[in-house]
Amino acid sequence: MLIPKRVKYRKQHRGRPGGGMAKGGKEINFGEYGLMALEPAWITNRQIEAARIAMTRHIKRGGKVWIRIFPDKPITAKPAETRMGSGKGTPEYWVAVVKPGRIMFELAGVTEEVAREAMRLASHKLPIKTKFVKRGEVGEVNEG
């Protein structure tokens, strides 16, 4: 699973949910096909791993998968039935902050229909709406 090796600060503020479109990571740089986010969300390291496994199982050594997002934000949680106060909880899991327009996964070395099906299987593991995009086209987020 993806987690940072070292972090400067163990705990972070949660921040406000995403306003606006992704600034970077909107183009396909490595593969031929990509999976684009259409909604803002926090994607956990477990969800990224589940999507990766779903894709690699479908393509069966045929192609290469690139993960373009990295979970670098720690999310803390307090134990169940704990009284309020006594500080912030311990980091429980890590998330990647994803905004609309962001390419999350890329795929190369397979046919378009295999790539489409692999991305569809991966999208079922993610908590947001996504869109399949090809290398040449710069995807518009408002298209369904």
From Swiss-Prot:
SUPFAM superfamilies reported in the protein's UniProt record: Ribosomal protein L16p/L10e (SSF54686)
InterPro entries: Ribosomal_uL16 (IPR047873), Ribosomal_uL16_bact-type (IPR000114), Ribosomal_uL16_CS (IPR020798), Ribosomal_uL16_dom (IPR016180), Ribosomal_uL16_sf (IPR036920)
One cellular-component annotation, GO: cytosolic large ribosomal subunit
Keywords from the named record: Ribonucleoprotein, Ribosomal protein, RNA-binding, rRNA-binding, tRNA-binding
Region (Disordered): 1-23
PANTHER family: 50S/60S RIBOSOMAL PROTEIN L16, LARGE RIBOSOMAL SUBUNIT PROTEIN UL16M
Protein's recorded name: Large ribosomal subunit protein uL16
